[in-house]
């Protein structure tokens, strides 16, 4: 039997040794970001996505192994565990297969077969099921089991009881269930019909049928939701005449007098027990698969949103639009510190709009505002139009519509109250919106990832699994970018490898009590932050103020000695690194030979390459290499759009059936999957990601329904 490491190696296409190394590192308490970044020699430079797949599958396979042992122990307790059964359980590849094998031995609720066994009909059932050549006719065999005292009045009663027992035995057969399950998933169809006459968003599924292998995940989730709301009736279909022959071949022995009786028992087993059970299993399996796909897509969309390039170092105004409570305003400096707040009422009438423009213009001039961030919620359209009007008298100032999802939840929460105790709840959301433009990652980590709103059906998914996946993405992003130890919030620090909520708060408390950290080593003085946590977190924390230039790089303290040897070998020093005067470092290393240099300084080649990159760009932010966000000074209206126009926009969301693109008209346009590119793709994420800047062609505009149809593939280069 293959070991867990061998199974994972085969699934991931990795050497067994690498997989064993990763398992050992995980078991020692190392995090995925730490393993991905600082243990490349041990796993061949697998990326964080592959490592998380490995971790997820490792957990599943360990749970599977645990369940195997539990099942064997339970069957052994009944004195029924044979070598063959134990071997079958050990080689079961899924929890469903283990469940099938355990099914005959599992304690059941009272069934028709249970009642028949209590009437003493088990021997009759076994006699008929054996289908020996000399087996008497069922009616004759049943005569011996007539017993009015037990409720078996006639031979027909005895045969009915025997049928019930045989049907349950057939239904509990692991091989039969596996074969029919496979047939259902290959040849079955999902059908949904209207359960009501009223119109709804589920009208597409009022008379819908599709082969199971071709079902898209978003359709499964939509149908599930429609069924839950009582608007759809859903069934799984399988051609009975295709299933029964397979069942008969597994059970019926030709030439026996009991053959026709057993055929009838097969049909009863299929109709009454097997099919309803497999239908439930199929629905569950389809839902699980759709959920995993949706969670994966949510995670895929979340990553580029978190890694949006920051617009740092500029005074920024945040506008949280609204009707009843007005438009909340906050001005922050280049570091995110609040300079001013107010509320204006541009939607109350023309006079109030003029007053709002005058007030905001004065604030912009007073503080030297460079950019304005506008939340995309209620009254965003009117606020954007007011801003554009205002910018005509403010040359050099630009604006951007910012996704405000989760801002209201954050502003009313404990975290915002601790951060801004002196500001009203409504003003806190304006501060958050401004900061989202300045540094999206630092601000978005304060919000539950589910609330960021870049997924489908996230409220229908298993929340624990969704949380795990999304928190993993946030963790990967935070550690990929790196965190300034002396300015980061506890929310941001909490996602750093090796840290948790408690140690993150302890770092902030230590910083407030003792002043800025002079270097990374000082972390070891933080309460509850021991050597293991330091090992895991140190490389991801930056200290720009440190005397040691390496403290402001992604070089891990364990590699400081190697980095210093490398600099000496290449005739460079700390000051050269600080001044950015080591551009030719990689060329020098390649000229000397990477393998030779790596051996000389005592690290592997992957670590050497990472050290060189960090020395060449100390304090670098990987987000600066990504396309800058589109800052606008003017606005389009839907009525301005005409088919054939080519516009530049930002991808806001990627889902199964297409891509939503912000083209600056407040209403995102849809690029249907068929219009994403000329080649066939299974999913739009094969081509684009959230945050991508794309050119689109306007295909159609429906002002009444607020729909804009776009194409990417029809844009002429």
Where are these regions (language model features)?
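A glycine-rich phosphate-binding loop feature that marks nucleotide/adenosyl-phosphate handling sites
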Residues: 182-189, 319-323, 377-382, 402-409, ...
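Duplex nucleic acid-engaging cores and interfaces of nucleic-acid transaction enzymes
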Residues: 50-53, 60-318, 322-423, 430
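Structured, non-catalytic alpha/beta "coupling" segments that mediate domain-domain communication
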Residues: 74, 88, 99-102, 226-239, ...
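Generic start-of-chain signal for non-secretory N-termini
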Residues: 1-20, 27
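Short, ordered loop/turn segments at secondary-structure junctions
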Residues: 38-40, 129, 239, 321, ...
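Long, highly charged, low-complexity intrinsically disordered interaction regions
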Residues: 4, 56, 62-80, 90, ...
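Single-stranded RNA-binding regions, centering on S1/OB-family and related RNA-binding modules
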Residues: 543-717
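Short flexible coil/turn linkers enriched for glycine and charged/polar residues
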Residues: 15-16, 28-29, 95-96, 121, ...
